[in-house]
């Protein structure tokens, strides 16, 4: 072989196994809450289960992990596929930037665990790369504790193979949320600080194993309910076909969740919230935008929303096109949301109703108050999560 050819091979060997871009198509599905609404079933009280997200915050010292969020996934709307084991056992998961652990149902789940019976289950005996761990784990949700034990195996995402990933095998899943869920489990993509049992999060393993060229991942969430794919998770870069213009960046202010500083929330009719600035979390695991209850009530009034039941607000469907623009200021840049973008249309018992995409949620100090920017915000704005620079970038979706 010519010396030049040998040099090329040597350079390739030195570069290592880095992949260019890993594309994971996301499927959009009807959230559990909306599905229950459409069939007229009882919806768990939002206040009783702290609405869409509840945080067990009393942040620990920096040397200690922050206590895990208390969270439910009644409003999750996007999932993708991963594999666990060799050969890969397939699971659908919510890629959640609001938590840090990976878990899927276990073949050892309790006989009466209906959620487990209805979903794919991991079977260690069928994997040649399984390594026993056995540590018990529990994640506390508003409806109870999801519990099980830890195991270690290879996780496949696209054409990436992430070795030695510790994950949870769930043997008990609480409440109706996971029974009705279209997804099998959760893949957390937040920082190690909030990882239960100090497990190394999935994306941290990707970084440590140098599997991608840039330690970033990005989300495109298609808000058109009839379009496919429902969205895309991209590891290692961004996809220009989904956005226009340059990214505007904001620094992460607390490396636990993807938490950033928000300058203000402005309604076109003159109302300003988050005066003087506030903290916000960018969270792909929930669909709504939440904020302190008192402020969100003012916001609902300003957009003409009326209280319905259990924390939900209804808006007259024929007024959507004339609703005031709501502008979130981040890093000195305005991010506008129109009525078409912050209102959901839901079919309920043969009738169509329109629900506000905002919800009240009080997160106590020292962690709060907080705003949560879910899919209502991420949908119109292509979002990049950058671990190299601990920042979040936004660009307008096309």
UniProtKB/Swiss-Prot annotation:
Which Cys-Cys disulfides exist here?
109-116, 274-278, 317-354
| The Peptidase A1 domain, residue ranges | 78-395
User: One GO molecular-function annotation for this sequence?
Assistant: aspartic-type endopeptidase activity
| Gene Ontology BP terms | apoptotic process involved in morphogenesis; autophagosome assembly; execution phase of apoptosis; insulin catabolic process; insulin receptor recycling; lipoprotein catabolic process; positive regulation of apoptotic process; proteolysis
- Using the record, list the residue span of the signal peptide; answer none if the entry has no such feature: 1-20
Annotated catalysed reactions = Specificity similar to, but narrower than, that of pepsin A. Does not cleave the 4-Gln-|-His-5 bond in B chain of insulin
Q: What is its EC number?
A: 3.4.23.5
Propeptide residues per the UniProt entry: 21-63
Please indicate which superkingdom the organism of origin belongs to: Eukaryota
Say where the protein is mainly found: other
Q: Which Pfam families match?
A: Asp
Task: Provide a GO CC annotation, any one.
Answer: membrane raft
Q: In which tissues is it expressed?
A: Oocytic yolk, preovulatory follicles, liver.
Record InterPro entries:
Aspartic_peptidase_A1, Aspartic_peptidase_AS, Cathepsin_D, PEPTIDASE_A1, Peptidase_aspartic_dom_sf
Q: Sorted alphabetically, which keywords does the UniProt record give?
A: Aspartyl protease, Disulfide bond, Glycoprotein, Hydrolase, Lysosome, Protease, Signal, Zymogen
Active site, per annotation: 96, 283
Record function comment: Acid protease active in intracellular protein breakdown. In chicken it is a key enzyme for yolk formation as it is capable of catalyzing intra oocytic break down of protein components of both vitellogenin and VLDL.
Q: Which family does it belong to?
A: Belongs to the peptidase A1 family.
- Subunit text: Consists of a light chain and a heavy chain.
Name of the protein this chain belongs to: Cathepsin D
The organism of origin for this protein: Gallus gallus
Species classification:
Eukaryota, Metazoa, Chordata, Craniata, Vertebrata
């Amino acid at each position: 072989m010519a010396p030049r050819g040998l040099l090329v091979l040597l350079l390739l060997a030195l570069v290592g196994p880095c992949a260019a871009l890993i594309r994971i198509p996301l499927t959009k599905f009807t959230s559990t809450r909306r599905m229950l609404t459409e069939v007229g079933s009882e919806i768990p009280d939002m206040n009783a289960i702290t609405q869409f997200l509840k945080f067990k915050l009393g942040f620990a010292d920096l040397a200690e992990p922050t206590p895990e969020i208390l969270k439910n996934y009644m409003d999750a709307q996007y999932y993708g596929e991963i594999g666990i084991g060799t050969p890969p056992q397939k699971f659908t998961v919510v890629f959640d930037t609001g938590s840090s652990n990976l878990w899927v149902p276990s073949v050892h789940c309790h006989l009466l665990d209906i959620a487990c019976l209805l979903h794919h289950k991991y079977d260690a005996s069928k994997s040649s790369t399984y390594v026993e761990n056995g540590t018990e784990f529990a994640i506390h949700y508003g409806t109870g504790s999801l519990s099980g034990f830890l195991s270690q195996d290879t996780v496949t995402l696209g054409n990436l193979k992430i070795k030695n990933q510790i994950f949870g095998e769930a043997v008990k899943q609480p409440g109706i949320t996971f029974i009705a869920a279209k997804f099998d489990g959760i893949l957390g993509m937040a920082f190690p600080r909030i990882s239960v049992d100090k497990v190394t999060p999935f994306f941290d393993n990707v970084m440590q194993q140098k599997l991608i060229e840039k330690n970033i991942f990005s989300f495109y969430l298609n808000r058109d309910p009839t379009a496919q794919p429902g969205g895309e998770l991209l590891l290692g870069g961004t996809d220009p076909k989904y956005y226009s213009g340059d990214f505007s960046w904001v620094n992460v202010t607390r490396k636990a969740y993807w938490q950033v500083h928000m300058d203000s929330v402005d309604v076109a009719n003159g109302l300003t919230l988050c005066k003087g600035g506030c903290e916000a979390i960018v969270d792909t695991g929930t669909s709504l935008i939440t904020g302190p209850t008192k402020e969100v009530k003012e916001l609902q009034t300003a957009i003409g929303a009326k209280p319905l039941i259990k924390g939900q607000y209804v808006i007259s469907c024929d007024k959507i096109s004339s609703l005031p623009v709501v502008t979130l200021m981040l890093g000195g840049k305005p991010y506008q949301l129109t009525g078409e973008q912050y209102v959901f249309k839901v079919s309920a018992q043969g009738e169509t109703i329109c629900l506000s995409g905002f919800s009240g949620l009080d997160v106590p100090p020292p962690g709060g108050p907080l705003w949560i920017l879910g899919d209502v915000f991420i949908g119109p704005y292509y979002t990049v999560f950058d671990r190299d620079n601990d920042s979040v970038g936004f660009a307008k979706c096309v």
